[in-house]
Every structure is written in C-alpha cells, then in structure tokens.
Design a protein with these regions (language model features):
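Vicinal oxygen chelate
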Residues: 1, 4-14, 44-48, 67-141
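Short hydrophobic-acidic sequence motifs that mark active-site Asp/Glu residues
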Residues: 53-55, 79, 127
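Core segments of cupin and vicinal oxygen chelate
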Residues: 9-63
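N-terminal beta-strand motif that seeds the catalytic metal site of vicinal oxygen chelate
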Residues: 1-19, 31, 37, 79-82, ...
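Short, charged, solvent-exposed linker or helix-capping segments at domain edges/interfaces
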Residues: 57, 66-68, 130, 140-141
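A short alpha-helix capping/helix-coil boundary motif
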Residues: 21-23, 71-74, 100
C-alpha cells in the first residue's frame, strides 16, 4: 500500500462547538461547515501542514455512515501530535488550548528523549500531544 493518508477525521458530539474550538480557539484555518445540504453530510475541514487536513464530523453521522455502534470516545486509543519548532511554543499552544476550553491532562514537562511535551483533551475528549522534539523539528518551521 502506498501511503496516501490525507485526512484525519474526529467524531464530535457538537459540530458547532467543535468548529469554534478549533477555528476560534486554536486558530486552525477552515472554510467552516460544508455539506449541510446532505443528510449526515455536514463536516468541517481544517488545513494542516503538508497538505494534510483535520476533519470534524458529528459522531452520530459517522455512526450512520459506517453502520458501527456508537461508543464513547477513548482518549487512550489515539492521540493527535502537534510538533512545534521551539520548546517555548509547547507552553504557548497548551495555554491557547486551555483558554479555548481544553482540559490539560499533563502539563508540559521534559521528556525521556530530550524533548518537552504536554497533553490536552479537546471538548470531545480527543487527546492531543503538543511536543517539541529537538531530533524532529518540523520541516516548515
């Protein structure tokens, strides 16, 4: 399989609340919610680096589309990593997330690999790691 992963979709309880968190709170660029004209089609896409997109889609619509049973979000089954270019950016992003309504799970601290990182949960419980790793500085930094 040639890797062509281009969109990561998070199931959310409230699409409007999640849009506000990511767009207004974290400042992620988006055109807002699209697809409202389709039953179960409303979704928002956020532009990330390298052409990657983050999507938020109502969990009930994701359940409808897949046919799977709805389950609670498990913050320990998947994390979204946000790598930053400088150590102090970890603190800044974590503070921004807290102001936007995130729950700080683990305050930023030194890591075993020589980096600096912290964790927060978005309003839906999705776990994010904000990390500075001196051995893995983002190319677009």
């Amino acid at each position: 399989m040639k890797p062509r992963i281009s969109v990561l979709t998070l199931g959310v309880a409230d699409l409007e609340q999640s849009l506000a968190f990511y767009r207004d709170g974290l400042g992620l660029p988006t055109k807002g919610i699209v697809g409202r004209e389709f039953e179960h089609g409303a979704v928002a896409f956020f532009e990330l680096s390298g052409g990657m997109k983050l999507a938020i889609w109502a969990q009930d619509d994701l359940v409808h589309d897949t046919g799977l049973a709805k389950t609670p979000i498990s913050p320990t089954s998947f994390t979204v990593g946000h790598n930053v270019a400088r150590r102090e950016e970890v603190d800044a992003v974590m503070a921004q997330a807290r102001r936007a309504g995130a729950e700080i799970v683990k305050a930023p601290q030194d890591t075993f690999y020589g980096g600096y990182a912290g964790y927060f949960r978005d309003p839906n419980g999705h776990l994010w790691e904000v990390v500075w790793n001196p051995a893995n500085i983002p190319a677009d930094a």
